[in-house]
């Protein structure tokens, strides 16, 4: 451990905020494996107890983005979109954001979905996609080929962020939320231009939008929907929208989209096998209305953020029409087939 890193740790332990560059230095040391487990635990808890600042979150994200395995981002008209949540909201819902990515892609967006295994549900994005035969550890060039040909790819977080492994045992033993809970959505190796990002707490909505602005994201909606890290079908969603470098706070309700609220229990998921059946039904234009509407709400807001709809409501209508066409399911089948090309 260098003298500079030791001084930064002491500064953190003293309750003093770090600059963005200082936070980057500390977390670069972490992902290089230079900090032992006790030090990592002390760092994460010192930040948690005081409360992480915008600069600290941004600096940690800078370090992890810089250390990531590179993704050969293709030159695409219209930019790249990600639909992602922090997880950790405590609800075991169906895979709303993951399912919404296929709808957005079928409606014309280029979606690079960055995900991992489950945090709060029984089935995270990679758990679900594996059920459809999608090769999670596809080579970066294969993922880029999928994005260019199909308008969608999946980037499995551990495949790109090997340095995070140094914090895994500590996070498991601490068994409490830390900075790493919000870092995942911020370190997509495709560096998306547009994001619909759900957070597990309303208090994170504006701060994370400020971080996205600092990281250079062009347009985004950061959302929290009455307990869920999604746009809510069961109640009011708090939104902070990033547009042209400015942040605007507002709320959305199901009635804004011509929908009646449902009970959150109607969105409960199950095992990866159960959720795969639900996702397939939704993408084929079948299944429960509540499932369809929850996915279309999130896909619609993402299409709005990506500039493919003038309003969230117009995005919702486009998503509903896309689901009815069955084209979203075709995207899923296409990704499953193309992701396997490394094995051919």
UniProtKB/Swiss-Prot annotation:
Q: Where does Mg(2+) 1 bind?
A: 97, 230
Stated name of the protein:
Anthranilate phosphoribosyltransferase
The UniProt note on the cofactor reads as follows:
Binds 2 magnesium ions per monomer.
> Which biological processes are named by the entry's GO terms?
L-tryptophan biosynthetic process
List, separated by semicolons, the cofactors it needs: Mg(2+)
Quote the catalytic activity from the record: N-(5-phospho-beta-D-ribosyl)anthranilate + diphosphate = 5-phospho-alpha-D-ribose 1-diphosphate + anthranilate
Keyword line: Amino-acid biosynthesis, Aromatic amino acid biosynthesis, Glycosyltransferase, Magnesium, Metal-binding, Transferase, Tryptophan biosynthesis
Q: In which pathway does it act?
A: Amino-acid biosynthesis; L-tryptophan biosynthesis; L-tryptophan from chorismate: step 2/5
- Species name: Shewanella amazonensis (strain ATCC BAA-1098 / SB2B)
